[in-house]
From Swiss-Prot:
Organism superkingdom: Archaea
Role: Nucleoside triphosphate pyrophosphatase that hydrolyzes dTTP and UTP. May have a dual role in cell division arrest and in preventing the incorporation of modified nucleotides into cellular nucleic acids.
UniProt organism field: Methanococcoides burtonii (strain DSM 6242 / NBRC 107633 / OCM 468 / ACE-M)
One GO CC term, this protein: cytoplasm
Similarity comment: Belongs to the Maf family. YhdE subfamily.
EC number annotated for this UniProt entry: 3.6.1.9
Protein name: dTTP/UTP pyrophosphatase
InterPro entries for the chain: ITPase-like_fam (IPR029001), Maf-like (IPR003697)
Length: 195
């Protein structure tokens, strides 16, 4: 199998990629610093960040496939990244309570051997339940929201805050597996080799 490198420190992305290709990849964290760019819309921004992460990690390798991603939650015209404090998480959850939000992941797959690069985004509609202040406080105090875009983890306790989704569940977690699997197959990485 060709070398595959995940350009992410996210344990969730590592777990998701292993669902597709087993542990046949290495992790190399990008040193690219994400900064908001006012001239870009949210979709352009997450694609730009994922591309810059992939390019940064590619400098450390001679060959292989680099996979990078950037996920945000978008609500009422605002980008919600990862909350840095408990109070920030509380404010985010109060803001998204009872609303439909978008989980948007920019993803780049860079084949260093062929020069092919796919950079695109995947969106998933997420309908949040109306949360009471006690629910928000309890969830925030669990600590789970702190390193999650939009302050909720659909794959964890935050699942009870989500009424429904329309789109790729794994995109909300941080890596759109359906689209990623399709692109990897196109680049010669067989998802079903070990089946």
């Amino acid at each position: 199998m060709r070398k595959v490198v995940l350009a992410s420190a996210s344990p969730r992305r590592k777990e998701l990629l292993s669902k597709l290709i087993g542990n046949n990849f290495e992790v190399c964290v990008s040193s690219y610093e994400e900064t908001p760019l006012q001239e870009m819309n949210v979709e352009e921004l997450v694609v730009f960040h994922s591309l810059e992460k992939a390019k940064d990690v590619a400098l450390r390798f001679d060959s292989g496939i680099i996979i990078s991603a950037d996920t945000v939650v978008f609500c009422d015209g605002a980008i919600l990244g990862k909350p840095h404090t408990l109070n920030n998480a509380k404010e985010m959850l109060e803001n998204i309570s009872g609303k439909s939000v978008l989980a948007i992941t920019g993803m780049t797959i860079l084949d260093m051997d062929s020069g092919k690069c796919v950079s695109e985004y995947v969106s998933t509609d997420v309908n949040m339940k109306q949360m009471s202040s006690d629910e928000i406080a309890s969830y925030v105090n669990s600590g789970e929201p702190l390193d999650k875009a939009g302050a909720f983890a659909i794959q964890g306790k935050g699942a009870v805050l989500v009424e429904s989704i329309n789109g790729d569940f794994f995109n909300v977690v941080g890596l759109p597996l359906f689209r990623l699997g399709t692109i990897l197959e196109e680049m010669g990485i067989s998802i079903f080799d070990d089946c």
